[in-house]
From Swiss-Prot:
Family stated for the protein in its record: Belongs to the methyltransferase superfamily. L-isoaspartyl/D-aspartyl protein methyltransferase family.
GO BP terms, alphabetized: methylation; protein modification process; protein repair
CDD domains per UniProt: AdoMet_MTases
Catalytic activity entry: [protein]-L-isoaspartate + S-adenosyl-L-methionine = [protein]-L-isoaspartate alpha-methyl ester + S-adenosyl-L-homocysteine
Gene: pcm
Highest rank taxon of the organism: Bacteria
The protein's enzyme class: transferase
Pfam families: PCMT
Entry annotation: catalytic residues: 65
Official protein name in the record: Protein-L-isoaspartate O-methyltransferase
C-alpha cells in the first residue's frame, strides 16, 4: 500500500472517529487531532503505524503515547483550563506539544533525553510551531517561566512533584499519572490558593518520570 498524504488523511479521520466512539467528546481536542499530522512525528519507515491506537517506541526507552491516552489527558486539561500557558513535562516526539499548540495554548515543554529533545526541536522549527523547549529535569518544572495555567506530565511519578504544584497559577491544574512503575492512576490536581484538590481517574501504564522529584534512574532499571 502506498502511504500518500491522502491515505494518512483518511487514517487520521478514522482515528478521530475512534476517539469519539471511545468517549472523547471535547470538540477542541478532536479538532486538534484532526489538524495535527501525527505521522510526521514518527520515523518515515514507521509512519504506517502512526494512526494505530497504540503506543509506539521512539527510542531511548521512551514512547509516543497511544492517541486515546493523549486525547484523554488533553481533555482533562482542556475541560478545566481553556486557554493560557501550559507546561508539558516529557516532550518525547513533540506530538503532544503540537496538539496543545493547535488548541491555542502557549506551550512550554521539557525533555531530559538530549537526542529526543534535538529531534523534537527540529520538528518544531520545521513546522513553525511556536513551542518553547528546554533540555532538563522536567520534575523540577521551569521556574523562570512560571506560573503556568496547567502542567501536563507525560510520564509516571510515584507522587506529585512539589515543584510542579508550586509553579501552578491559582485555579491552575496538574494532570499527571501517579502510582507504581507498572500501573498508574490518571490524576488531576487543582490549585485553589494554597489548597490542592485531587481527583483520580482511569488507570494507565506510562514510562517513568526520571528526575529529582520522580523516579531515580536506578529504580527504572531494576
Amino acid at each position: 500500500m502506498e502511504w500518500s498524504e491522502s491515505v494518512f488523511d483518511g487514517r487520521r479521520r478514522e482515528m478521530v472517529e475512534g476517539l469519539r466512539r471511545s468517549g472523547i467528546m471535547n470538540a477542541r481536542v478532536l479538532e486538534a487531532f484532526l489538524e495535527v499530522r501525527r505521522h510526521l512525528f514518527f520515523p518515515e519507515s514507521e509512519r504506517e503505524h502512526a494512526y494505530d491506537d497504540a503506543a509506539w517506541p521512539i527510542g531511548h526507552g521512551q514512547t509516543i503515547s497511544q492517541p486515546y491516552t493523549v486525547a484523554y489527558m488533553t481533555s482533562l486539561l482542556a475541560d478545566r483550563v481553556p486557554s493560557g500557558k501550559v507546561l508539558e513535562v516529557g516532550t518525547g516526539s513533540g506530538y503532544q506539544s503540537a496538539i496543545l499548540d493547535a488548541m491555542g495554548y502557549r506551550v512550554f515543554t521539557i525533555e531530559r533525553v538530549a537526542a529526543l529533545y534535538s529531534e523534537a526541536l527540529g520538528r518544531f522549527r520545521r513546522f513553525a510551531l511556536p513551542v518553547a523547549a528546554k533540555l532538563g529535569d522536567g520534575s523540577e518544572g521551569w521556574p523562570e517561566e512560571a506560573p503556568f495555567n496547567a502542567v501536563l506530565v507525560t510520564a509516571a511519578a510515584p507522587k506529585e512533584p512539589e515543584a510542579l504544584l508550586r509553579q501552578l497559577s491559582d485555579n491552575g491544574c496538574l494532570v499527571i499519572p501517579l502510582g507504581g512503575m507498572d500501573v498508574q492512576q490518571m490524576t488531576v490536581i487543582t490549585r485553589r490558593g494554597e489548597v490542592f484538590l485531587k481527583e483520580r481517574y482511569h488507570e494507565f501504564a506510562f514510562v517513568p518520570l526520571i528526575g529529582r522529584e520522580g523516579w531515580e534512574e536506578e529504580q527504572e532499571q531494576s
